[in-house]
Every structure is written in structure tokens, then in C-alpha cells.
């Protein structure tokens, strides 16, 4: 069959390429995976595109996104620049400076193989109680739009892009999944849409994120007028629209439902973010909606065209076609040893009991060594068991430091065991899921041998998909 590179090289049209894809392939393309998918850069927000062997066989790469409005969020411990927040940028009134700053951020995205930043945030400052106002630029739609466009232009100079969010009227955090914004058309056009319109028309934004909540009766991820009429027909937008993470949608007159992905497909919200497994057809209503005619294959193909069109212009496609410059490849080789280890990270899955077993016999545990690994877990409280030994005497002190998602967890000081194996068990805490988390262990002394580490499932807690 044809490869996506054949579209890039203009040997075939995008429609000819998409015609090869099965209904199942099209549904999988609609679903992103995350957070921290092992199929893309460790510690990032989502993966989308070529997430299965079937899609990879068509030459579709997995593209990557990560937060956010204050710089790259890399939860595995990779260092990144912290940027001034959106309000601070707005206070400069300096478009040239902001554009240059985001050109540098675009280079950082390229270095970390991230295709789209999940920002800028363009919601209007409406209430001082909004806990995320710092991410947003101002109460002025013109300033907001101009600053958003400058960020997108800067990212584009470096060959990257951003995702303007949250479209639209996400102006408070309390009860944001349910609170309804009731707004007149004039207020929407003049205030709440204006920043997005400027960023699309002047900044050539290629990625938009919808909100969690409803606007005038419809949850925005399933709002056809918002995602198709206003965004694409009125403004000429040609990129992708994605949901916020684990967002709901509804059909007019019905309650919202996290499984109602058919409403998103119909509205041209191209990507649902996120799932733990994009190939799982039981997690939403797409199969039954296609069978009973609520959605059509043509609508799935339309969404796929948007997604693949975005990927064609992304760094992921350049890597897929081996078209990355020698300079960029050399720059990636300049990472620290710790960053290089993160690139080669190993992921461990939970078993049927919810436990995660991590073998440690091959680890380098010399003083100053660092081990990083990923774990895929459900939302639960966990204990941690460390089975180890040391040839040293009982008076020896052997400290290790545990980090989870780059946040300090605990320092444990073991004693020498004269070669005898022992198991240390203690509370580890709550891990939210379904998601991947990153564990880092720093060894503060030489002389400790690790046999294994086991995270023991204790009890379930509400997770991202509840």
C-alpha cells in the first residue's frame, strides 16, 4: 500500500492515501494516548497518529504534544526552561520580544522531539478567582490575540507549533467540567473568540484545544458550530482540533458523557485526548455509532485528513523520512548522560493484581548513579518493597533518594547486611491513572545491590477517567 511519505512527495493525494485505511484505523487515529505514552518522548502529554502496527505500516509516525503555557512540561525529569507566564508576557506589550522567546522554545521542542506545545492559553481574564489566570494573557481580546499570534509565529520559525486553548469561554476552574457559559453571539465574537481568530488569521495557528465544559447548551468538544462553522468556515482554519484531557461531549438536549465520542467526530473535534490504549474499541461509542448511522465513514475520513495533514508538516514526519539535519541530530547527542538514559527508558506494566515488578539486578548502583524507569498503573494507593543486600557491615550507611515524576518522594538509608538479602517495605502513596509515571532513584553511596522493586497495589482511588 501507499505510505504517508507518498503524499508528502506528491505522488498521491491525501484522499487516495486515506481511502486505504480501515474503519478501525480511522477510529484509532481519532484517539490520542497518554499521559506519558512510551511511544513518544518520555514525560510528555500525549501521542497521536501512528499508534498501532497497522498505522505504522502506512508510514504514519506517532506525533507528540506536551504542556504548556509556561514552558515544556517533561514529567520524567528532563530539564527544560521555565518561561514567564502568559500574564507576564502580556504586560510587556512587546510582540517582537515574545516572538523571539518562542522561537527559542520552538528549538527546545525540536530538541525534545515534541511536535506541538499545549499553549498558548487564550482565555480571557473574567474572574480574579480563576486559578489559571496566570496562564492567560489579559482581559483584552486584542492584546490576547496579538500575543498568541506572536507565540505561534515564533514557534513556527523553529519548525514547531503550539495549541491555542481552551476554545472557548473556559473562564473559571471551579466545576469546569459542568459549569455552563451562557454568552450572546456578539460577546462571543467581540470578546471570547477574538483572540483565537487573530491567532488563526495572523499567526497561522494549526492546533486548537476545546474546553471541558458546555457553552450555550453544548459541550464544546461536540459543538459543530464552534469547531466547524466558526473555526474552519469563517476563519479558514486548516489544522487539528483536540479535546482537553478526558473531556466529555453531548448531543443536543442530552447529558454529557465521556464515552460520547461520536458527538466529537460529528463536530470535527478531530482528536480525543487521551486514552491508555487507542486500539481499545470498547472505551467509546464509535463502533456502534458507525453501525447505526449516527456517524459516517466520511466523517472519520475528514478527521483523519486533518490529523494527517498536521503530521505531514510536523517534525515527526521529518524523522519518519530521515530528513532531520545533521546539526539537529548532533544537538540531540549533546544531552547529559542522565537525559540520554531517559531517552532509553524501560516501561513496566502492572499485573492482574495491580502490582508492578521491576527487576534491578543489572542496575549500576555505584555512588552518584541514577536509574530512571516508567510504570503504567491504575489510580490507587501503593506500597513499595525494595529487596536488596550489601556486603558491608551493619554500621554502614547506604542512602538512596526516590523521586516520582521528578518530585522528591523520600530518602531511605539502608544499613549493610553482610551479604544477606532483606526486603524493606513502606508506604509509597497515591498514583493517579490510568497513566504512566516515572520513578528515579539516586544512589548516594557504593555497596548496595538491588534484586527488585515491587509496587504493591493497596486500594483503588478515583482516577482521570472517573
Give each language-model segment a name.
Residues 1-370, 374-383, 399-421, 429-431, ...:
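Glycoside hydrolase catalytic-domain context in secreted enzymes
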Residues 112, 386-391, 444:
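Solvent-exposed strand-to-loop "edge" motifs in beta-rich extracellular domains
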Residues 389-398, 447-448:
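Extended, low-complexity, turn-rich repeat/linker tracts enriched in Gly/Pro/Ser/Thr and Asp/Glu
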Residues 440-448:
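Short beta-strand-plus-loop segments that form exposed binding edges in beta-rich domains
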Residues 450-455:
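Edge beta-strands of extracellular beta-sandwich domains
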Amino acid at each position: 500500500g501507499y505510505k504517508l511519505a507518498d503524499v508528502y512527495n506528491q505522488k498521491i493525494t491525501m484522499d487516495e492515501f486515506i481511502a486505504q485505511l480501515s474503519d478501525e484505523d480511522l477510529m484509532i487515529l481519532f484517539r490520542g494516548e497518554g499521559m506519558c505514552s512510551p511511544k513518544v518522548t518520555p514525560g510528555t502529554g500525549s501521542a497521536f497518529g501512528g499508534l498501532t502496527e497497522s498505522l505504522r505500516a502506512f508510514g504514519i509516525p506517532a506525533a507528540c504534544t506536551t504542556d504548556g503555557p509556561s514552558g515544556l512540561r517533561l514529567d520524567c525529569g528532563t530539564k527544560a526552561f521555565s518561561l514567564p507566564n502568559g500574564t507576564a508576557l502580556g504586560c510587556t506589550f512587546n510582540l517582537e520580544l515574545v516572538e523571539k522567546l518562542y522561537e527559542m522554545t520552538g528549538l527546545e521542542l525540536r530538541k525534545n522531539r515534541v511536535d506541538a506545545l499545549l499553549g498558548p492559553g487564550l482565555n480571557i481574564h473574567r474572574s480574579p478567582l480563576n486559578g489559571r489566570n496566570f496562564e492567560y494573557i489579559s482581559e483584552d481580546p486584542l492584546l490576547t490575540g496579538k500575543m498568541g499570534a506572536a507565540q505561534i509565529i515564533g514557534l513556527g520559525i523553529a519548525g514547531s507549533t503550539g495549541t491555542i486553548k481552551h476554545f472557548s469561554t473556559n473562564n473559571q476552574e471551579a466545576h469546569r467540567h459542568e459549569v455552563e457559559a451562557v454568552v450572546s453571539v456578539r460577546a462571543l465574537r467581540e470578546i471570547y473568540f477574538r483572540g483565537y481568530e487573530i491567532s488563526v488569521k495572523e499567526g497561522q495557528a494549526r492546533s486548537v484545544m476545546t474546553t471541558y465544559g458546555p457553552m450555550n447548551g453544548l459541550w464544546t468538544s461536540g459543538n459543530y458550530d464552534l469547531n466547524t462553522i466558526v473555526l474552519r468556515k469563517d476563519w479558514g482554519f486548516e489544522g487539528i482540533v483536540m479535546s482537553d484531557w478526558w473531556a466529555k461531549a453531548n448531543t443536543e438536549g442530552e447529558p454529557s458523557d465521556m464515552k460520547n465520542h461520536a458527538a466529537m467526530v460529528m463536530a470535527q473535534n478531530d482528536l480525543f485526548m487521551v486514552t491508555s490504549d487507542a486500539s481499545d474499541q470498547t472505551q467509546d461509542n464509535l463502533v456502534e455509532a458507525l453501525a447505526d448511522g449516527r456517524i459516517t465513514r466520511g466523517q472519520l475520513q475528514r478527521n483523519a485528513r486533518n490529523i494527517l495533514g498536521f503530521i505531514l508538516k510536523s517534525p515527526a514526519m521529518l524523522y519518519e523520512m530521515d530528513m532531520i539535519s545533521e546539526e539537529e541530530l548532533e544537538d540531540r547527542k549533546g544531552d547529559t548522560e542522565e537525559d540520554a538514559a531517559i531517552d532509553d527508558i524501560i516501561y513496566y506494566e502492572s499485573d492482574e493484581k495491580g502490582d508492578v515488578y521491576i527487576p534491578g539486578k543489572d542496575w549500576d548502583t555505584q555512588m552518584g548513579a541514577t536509574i530512571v524507569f516508567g510504570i503504567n498503573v491504575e489510580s490507587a494507593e501503593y506500597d513499595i518493597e525494595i529487596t536488596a543486600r550489601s556486603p558491608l557491615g551493619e554500621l554502614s550507611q547506604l542512602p538512596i533518594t526516590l523521586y516520582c515524576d521528578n518530585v522528591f518522594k523520600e530518602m531511605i538509608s539502608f544499613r549493610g547486611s553482610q551479604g544477606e538479602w532483606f526486603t524493606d517495605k513502606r508506604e509509597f502513596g497515591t498514583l493517579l491513572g490510568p497513566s504512566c509515571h516515572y520513578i528515579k532513584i539516586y544512589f548516594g553511596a557504593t555497596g548496595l545491590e538491588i534484586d527488585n522493586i515491587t509496587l504493591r497495589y493497596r486500594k483503588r482511588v478515583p482516577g482521570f477517567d472517573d
